[in-house]
Swiss-Prot record:
This is Tautomerase PptA. It is an enzyme of class 5 (isomerase). The lineage of its organism: Bacteria, Pseudomonadati, Pseudomonadota, Gammaproteobacteria, Enterobacterales. It comes from Klebsiella pneumoniae (strain 342). One of its GO terms (cellular component) is cytoplasm. Keywords: Cytoplasm, Isomerase. The active site is at 2 (proton acceptor). NCBIfam families: PRK01271.1. Disulfide bonds: none annotated.
Length: 75
């Protein structure tokens, strides 16, 4: 409330980089959604490139109308 689940190809991020990413996303949500810091949760799910089609099929394509930033690619 809000919860953000970032899915991306695998990256070698340090714990410090993950913390910074979460802090930046949290800051944006606080600013734009008037959320409290304690209400925000952020997940980072790394998906192998050969498994991305499943993400597209289950999460991106069916929700295209709800996406506030659409991808510049299709599958």
């Amino acid at each position: 409330m809000p919860h953000v689940d970032i899915k991306c190809f695998p990256r070698e991020l340090t714990d410090e980089q993950k913390t910074a990413l979460a802090a930046d996303i949290t800051e944006v949500l606080i600013r734009h959604l008037n959320s409290k810091e304690s209400a925000v949760s952020v997940a980072l799910t790394q998906v192998e490139p050969d498994a991305w089609q499943a993400v597209w099929d289950s999460e991106i394509a069916p929700q295209m109308a709800q996406l506030i930033k659409k991808p510049g690619y299709s599958m």
